[in-house]
């Protein structure tokens, strides 16, 4: 059986006492081996994390703030403008109101008109699950996927416990996109142009746009 031999290289700085050139053998670079089970786990475990997150978010609508957001969204679509005065306080109806959530309110109103509360709940689950997976993808590179998933389990428990149909669900998505871009700017600098678009939408959906 023939055996591959490494190619000898000459090191000009390494010489014997007599002045003769010394040859050293350099081992060839070996391809990194990844078992089929490791390849499957690299995609399967994050997929399971996303599935558990999605299913955990499919619970009935409990948050009572949803309804005034929905009514405000209906008002915006009916009048074609964002309210400038308080719509809901009888004793102080002329107080100026800066509606920081109008983008979210229009979104849930459109979803509600198409599929009712059920579609709003599914959309919430999709948005928050996407936020989790994007943030998972953005962080922990170089760690074994099992460790990364294990570290994310407590976070998912907290996120699901707070997974309401509120404007903050969009903040979770936009913040995860910011993280994803930030961790890739050194390799893909053009991604920076995505951030103004994200920020423009975010600033019209939730007050936590200041995190971006």
Residue locations for each model-derived region?
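Transmembrane-helix motifs of polytopic, lipid-linked glycan transferases
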Residues: 122-141
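Membrane-interface alpha helices of multi-pass inner-membrane proteins
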Residues: 53, 155-159, 181, 192-207, ...
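Helix-to-loop transition at the C-terminal end of transmembrane segments
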Residues: 54-70
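Start-transfer (signal-anchor) and selected internal transmembrane alpha helices
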Residues: 1-55
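Specific aromatic-rich, kink-prone transmembrane helix
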Residues: 134, 154-158, 170-187
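Extracytosolic helix-loop segments that constitute the early lumenal/periplasmic catalytic or substrate-binding loops
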Residues: 74-95, 103
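Short hydrophobic/aromatic helix or loop-helix immediately within or flanking a transmembrane segment
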Residues: 91-118, 122
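Short acidic/glycine- and proline-prone juxtamembrane loop motifs at membrane-interface regions
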Residues: 163-170
């Amino acid at each position: 059986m023939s055996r591959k031999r490494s190619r000898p290289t000459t090191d000009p700085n390494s010489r014997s006492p007599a002045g003769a050139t010394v040859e050293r053998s350099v081992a060839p670079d070996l391809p990194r081996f990844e078992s089929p089970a490791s390849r499957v786990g690299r995609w399967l475990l994050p997929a399971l994390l996303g599935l558990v997150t999605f299913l955990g978010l499919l619970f009935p609508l409990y948050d009572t703030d949803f309804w005034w957001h929905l009514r405000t969204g209906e008002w915006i679509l009916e009048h074609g403008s964002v309210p400038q005065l308080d719509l809901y306080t009888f004793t102080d109806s002329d107080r100026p109101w800066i509606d920081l959530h109008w983008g979210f309110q229009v979104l849930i109103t459109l979803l509600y008109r198409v599929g009712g509360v059920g579609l709003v709940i599914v959309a919430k689950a999709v948005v928050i699950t996407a936020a989790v997976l994007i943030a998972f993808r953005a962080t922990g590179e170089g760690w074994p996927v099992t460790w990364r998933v294990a570290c994310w389990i407590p976070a998912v428990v907290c996120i699901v416990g707070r997974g309401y149909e509120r404007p903050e669900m969009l903040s979770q998505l936009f913040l995860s996109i910011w993280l994803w871009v930030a961790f890739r700017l050194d390799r893909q600098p053009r991604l920076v142009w995505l951030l103004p678009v994200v920020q423009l939408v975010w600033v019209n959906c939730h007050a936590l746009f200041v995190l971006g």
